[in-house]
Amino acid sequence: LFRPDGTPAAFVKVGLGPVADQLVATEAAALAAWARHPDPRLVVPDLLAATTWNGIRIAVVAPLPEDVRRLPPGTPSAWAVRDLDGPPSCAALADAPWWTRRTEREGDGPVRTLLEQIGDRHADATGSWARWHGDWVPWNLARCHRGLVAWDWEYSEPDAPVGLDEVHGAYQQARIVEQQPIAAALEVARLAAERLVAAGTSPGSPAELRRRAGTDEVPSPFPSARWLADLHLAMLLTRSTELERLAGTPPHDRAELLAAAEAGGRRR
């Protein structure tokens, strides 16, 4: 929406169809949560209204700051997002609500088999879980005089694996910007997980500094790079299944995703 003078007044998101309806609902809930617990490290557009019209869900979101500028190359850390629901929690995979939500929704089939393999592989690993943005990519991020700006929260979710935003951001850039096939993009995500885990245990990292100060028994929020890469794959698989359930037809790249996931599991 634009004012008479041509300046933006709001972005209006309309939930036409089951998929869009869920995305609009998710974004409205995330923005409402952010309004209750704002963090000065991140600038998030205000939720102006969340309503329905003839049964169609609508979210009205404030425009971006006037002085937003494109980010330099690279993906910034998502630490501010992780604190939205309070400090990250620690839990084994089997006890994590994020994992339970995924396994409970899956019936029999190849995705169920892949999830069981991931669950068995990391049964004894304890990781950190917190809010994630869901689409932490350069085209949803910018800078303004107040700091980092983030919008498009349609895939945000609580209790996600810490680090998922950065790993999925690397995957999305490989797929969308570089148009790499899924198998190659998964390899990019795996390398991003390795870099993140290495940085998370390096001297001077937040986790290492807390450990040295005696305030954190866990030296890193990531049990391993493979843990993070595998949970990213689980997210992709279950997101694809959920989109199929809502739309009534599988996403166009579902077969490619399953093939890449099964091939990757055989190689590891």
Sequence positions of predicted segments:
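ATP-binding glycine-rich loop module of kinase domains
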Residues: 1-25
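Conserved kinase catalytic-core helix
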Residues: 27-44, 57, 64-104, 108-139
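Regulatory N- and C-terminal appendages and interdomain linkers associated
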Residues: 246-268
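All-alpha amphipathic helical-bundle segments outside canonical DNA-binding/catalytic cores
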Residues: 220-233
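Active-site activation/catalytic loop segments of kinase-like enzymes and analogous catalytic loops
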Residues: 164-218, 233-248
